[in-house]
């Protein structure tokens, strides 16, 4: 399972938004079934934050959602475009 996309915040608050999620990222990377988690500032758009979550199964993602720590911050998301993807196969990007 992959959750990926982007959120937009006030550019003045972007670094704070990313930092507020540090604990969530660390917890996710140690959670059962989490293969990767990233919440990163976009290098081109100063308002954009890229979201990437990769879990072994839908159940692992559901468990994470039920137990994930909530960030303490209050940076408002102005717009979001994040989707969940069910993946049936994976392989090298250039084959």
Q: Positions of the model-derived regions?
A:
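Short, flexible segments with low predicted structural confidence
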Residues: 1, 15-16, 32-34
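Short, well-ordered beta-strand segments in beta-rich or mixed alpha/beta enzyme
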Residues: 1-8, 38-65
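Short, surface-exposed ligand-recognition loops at beta-strand->loop->(often short) alpha-helix junctions
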Residues: 8-17
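An amphipathic, aromatic/His-enriched active-site/gating alpha helix that lines ligand/cofactor pockets
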Residues: 23-35, 54-88
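Short, low-order "capping/linker" segments at domain edges
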Residues: 88-95
């Amino acid at each position: 399972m992959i959750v990926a996309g982007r959120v937009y915040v006030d550019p003045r608050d972007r670094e704070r938004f990313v930092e507020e999620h540090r604990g969530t990222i660390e917890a996710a990377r140690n959670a059962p079934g989490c293969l990767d988690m990233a919440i990163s500032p976009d290098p081109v758009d100063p308002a954009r934050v890229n979201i990437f979550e990769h879990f072994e199964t839908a159940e692992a993602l559901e468990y994470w959602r039920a137990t994930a720590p909530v960030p303490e911050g209050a940076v408002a998301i102005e717009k979001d475009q994040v989707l969940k993807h069910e993946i049936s196969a994976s392989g090298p990007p250039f084959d």
